[in-house]
């Protein structure tokens, strides 16, 4: 079996309530304190068995909601497993439908602007769910097939920042089309057409150029307009 040491792998402090902290350990336990660590409650579901709790993330919209990414890769079991609780750990629900085989999950985080819009980093890539985890789909685009160790939505820019294993940092510019799709596009309507509201663009005055080179790749200049066609025209 896999070696475990009772090590805390995940710690998440609530942004809603002072003193509320979640922890997850490599022996599969989840604990919750609501008094700043004076007392702890074991809220581990019995169904998990021998797992490692890789990450716990509190919902930015609901203090009772938390997402847990767990795995059994140390036992040569690469099944993707993600869970959500909506009542401070009293009950847990698995939300793993749609992940590829062996794409075990490193992290699940909820979009800070759109409830129910979730992003997941797995061992083989990145996923998105528009319905609170009921169904996941790939958000890979041109991202290399590499483990996604963590991800975060940039507060000001509204970009998705991704930390990979061995392939550097990647940024998905402007999440507003995904946020609008989660709110406005009819779920499962393949014939839906939608024009997304673009984010602000800036026209800059001329100035002296920068003579040096750079390693990064900037996004396109000007306004970017995103749209969805339910049916591709001939």
Model-identified regions with their sequence ranges:
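Short solvent-exposed strand-capping/beta-turn motif centered on an Asx-Ser/Thr pair
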Residues: 73, 230-232
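Extracellular acidic loop/turn motifs
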Residues: 16, 232-234
């Amino acid at each position: 079996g896999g070696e475990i040491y009772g090590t805390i792998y995940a710690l998440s402090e609530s942004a809603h309530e002072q003193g509320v902290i979640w922890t997850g350990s490599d022996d599969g336990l989840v604990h919750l304190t609501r008094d700043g660590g004076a007392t702890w409650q074991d809220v581990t579901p019995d169904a998990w068995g021998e797992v490692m709790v890789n990450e716990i993330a509190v919902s930015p919209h609901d203090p009772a909601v938390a997402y847990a990414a767990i795995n059994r890769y140390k036992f040569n079991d690469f099944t993707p497993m993600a869970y959500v609780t909506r009542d401070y750990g009293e009950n847990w629900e698995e939300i793993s439908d749609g992940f590829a085989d062996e794409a075990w999950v490193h992290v699940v985080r909820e979009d800070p602007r759109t409830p129910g819009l979730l992003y997941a980093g797995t061992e083989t890539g990145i996923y998105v769910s528009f319905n609170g985890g009921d169904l996941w789909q790939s958000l890979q685009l041109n991202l290399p097939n590499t483990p996604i160790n963590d991800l975060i939505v940039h507060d000001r820019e509204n970009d998705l920042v991704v930390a990979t294993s061995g392939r550097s940092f990647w940024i998905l510019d402007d999440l507003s089309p995904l946020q609008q799709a989660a709110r406005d596009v009819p779920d499962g309507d393949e014939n839906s057409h939608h024009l997304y509201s673009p984010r602000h663009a800036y026209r800059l005055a001329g100035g002296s150029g920068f003579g040096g080179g750079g390693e990064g790749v900037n996004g396109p200049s000007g306004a970017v307009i995103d749209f969805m066609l339910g049916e591709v025209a001939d």
